[in-house]
Amino acid sequence: MMRPVVVKEKRVNESQIHVVEEEVRQAKTMDRDIVTHAMKQSFAKLNPKVMIKNPIMFVVEIGFIITFILSFLPSHSSSVPGWFNITVSFILLFTVLFANFAEALAEGRGKAQADSLKHSKKDVFANVVKENGNIVQVSATDLRKGDVVIVKQGEMIPSDGEVIKGLASVDESAITGESAPVIKEAGGDFCSVTGGTMVVSDEITIIITSNPGESFIDKMISLVEGAARQKTPNEIALNTVLTSLTFIFLIVVVTLPIFTNYLGFQIDTAVLVALLVCLIPTTIGGLLSAIGIAGMDRVTKFNVLAMSGKAVEAAGDINTIILDKTGTITFGNRMAHTLLPVGNETIEQVGKWAAISSVLDETPEGRSVIEYVQAKSISYNRELAEQGEFVPFKAETRMSGVDLQDGTKVRKGAVGSVIEWVQSQGGTIPKDVNQKADFISKEGGTPLVVAVNNRIYGLIYLKDTVKPGMRERFEQLRQMGIKTVMCTGDNPLTAATIAKEAGVDEFVAECKPEDKIAVIKAEQDKGKLVAMTGDGTNDAPALAQADVGLAMNSGTTAAKEAANMIDLDSNPTKIIEVVGIGKQLLMTRGALTTFSIANDIAKYFAIIPAMFTLAIPQMEALNIMKLTSPLSAILSALLFNAVIIPLLIPLAMKGIAYKPMSSNALLGRNLLIYGLGGVIVPFIGIKVIDMIVGLFI
């Protein structure tokens, strides 16, 4: 009997191994295709109309053209041999190609994601309900805003919309990657559905909310392909600074021959071009676009759709995060925490009647009571409750329970409601009921009174549990200089208790959705950038007001349209990770800019002595690297300038390692690593290249 079992397990394992191997093979193939496409695009981007968008690399391309033309003209210079011009021109060409490759590689990853999304779009037909009630089948591409469509079990939702009738389980794995279906129903904050998702049970009627080309998937494709990508304000500002530096160095190099002629010697044009290319910030100039695209790509891989690069950058500058208590800081389900008997009652009696009142209660609270009683080994008669008539919770009564066959009425519910119910039947109220209810409220819990007919037995202490690790995460945000504000509809006592347990900096109790706008504006008036999450229509104004608004994919269309980011997993706590990604993007750009500018120091000591040593022998003192010859020094500096770009591509794509710490600590750390490193690495790199080049010159 054992052998078949063993063989079966072996087959399953082999099957799993084959699946994993196939996934790895496909991933390698996709990476190979991306690299191949990026290499082709590197040459396509040499078009001056494309290159002029990056002024720094455009100057390098012009330098390539000049030196390439000079290599075919008769040389009147005795300072450099004939092969020097062509060598310089090819080094400059590869410098531009490496920069183009970095940008094309980042774009290629986005296009690969877009292709997978395009494959998820299938030819779908929709059952449209006409005004006369007739149902007509049309192509999804013919649907318009306002059309009413019926979607049955097993059918694909044809376009974005909102449920106006019915309830169904929807498989959103094509969009979110989450295999578990989600419930969509008419009304409330969970009525929004996305085109391309599948109804796996029941039937719903939806009203279409987007025209062709405007659906959620269409927007995702457009964004990840980069068609909708615009340069962010920080990127534009940095690009302006780098372009200004390039212009200044260009003026210096162009006017330099005037001074050298005055001193009685001439500098070859190719040497001047080499000097210019080595002085301008080509490293960050070649990687700047790739860093921005890769930042958007990292957010997308995290299952968050950013509507613009500006939103990702803003996340990195956030000073304050507004968080809902329910579902974000806490689990959102109040669970039975303990039982408190009143008067002379025992905990066994409270547990018995609490369980009987909850047997038919399918709410999370009801199930948690049963689990608690069973965990405490308190006995109760389940069959007695199952044979009775369930009394569901209503907003008017604020109670639920069961009427047993012998006429006994068991109830659990809000303190005031149960007390009134007991008093209406002639019962007396134990003195410690309100005292213990106040204690539970002060602890941040919710008290439910358990009563049978005209007698109160005790209270159930329901507690909305804080998610594990939240205190540590808020401490990390505090180290980053980010303030956390919890907004909740709870009373001040409950809010204060939860805030203390979770470790948030501030809280706003009895907060209505419209109050969030006031909280956001108050922070913005102090010059702070604010982030918040939301999913309901009533959250839309606040999401629009916030600098970073993260809407849940499960939320309403209004919320998603107001936000500048959408979380496909509908996990409100992800705002913390989004802030981290934004900071990583800004730090990567800043670190590589520092590294690029610091490089100039080493290149200065390489190329300046090489230019002037023959005419001014005293300049040899600046040759601290003891480079082989002037020509070797110039070529080594140019080669290092070119090679460093592809070497830094992985760092630009992945982002530098980020650890939560204060701004001053981060600045000091990055200056040490990328500032000092930007000085030391070129000295070593240029010297090594010079030793190799010296063998051939």
Swiss-Prot record:
UniProt-recorded Gene Ontology molecular function terms: ATP binding; ATP hydrolysis activity; magnesium ion binding; P-type potassium transmembrane transporter activity
Active site: 324 (4-aspartylphosphate intermediate)
InterPro entries: ATPase_P-typ_cyto_dom_N, ATPase_P-typ_P_site, ATPase_P-typ_TM_dom_sf, ATPase_P-typ_transduc_dom_A_sf, HAD-like_sf, HAD_sf, P-type_ATPase_bsu_IA, P_typ_ATPase
Enzyme Commission numbers on file: 7.2.2.6
GO CC annotation: plasma membrane
Membrane topology term: Multi-pass membrane protein
Cell compartments where the protein resides: Cell membrane
Residues that bind ATP: 361, 365, 393-400, 412
Taxonomy, superkingdom: Bacteria
Record keywords: ATP-binding, Cell membrane, Ion transport, Magnesium, Membrane, Metal-binding, Nucleotide-binding, Phosphoprotein, Potassium, Potassium transport, Translocase, Transmembrane, Transmembrane helix, Transport
Parts of the chain that traverse the membrane: 55-75, 82-102, 245-265, 271-291, 605-625, 633-653, 677-697
Catalysed transformations (reactions): K(+)(out) + ATP + H2O = K(+)(in) + ADP + phosphate + H(+)
Residues that, per the record, bind Mg(2+): 535, 539
Family classification: Belongs to the cation transport ATPase (P-type) (TC 3.A.3) family. Type IA subfamily.
Subunit structure: The system is composed of three essential subunits: KdpA, KdpB and KdpC.
Protein purpose: Part of the high-affinity ATP-driven potassium transport (or Kdp) system, which catalyzes the hydrolysis of ATP coupled with the electrogenic transport of potassium into the cytoplasm. This subunit is responsible for energy coupling to the transport system and for the release of the potassium ions to the cytoplasm.
Identification of the protein by name: Potassium-transporting ATPase ATP-binding subunit
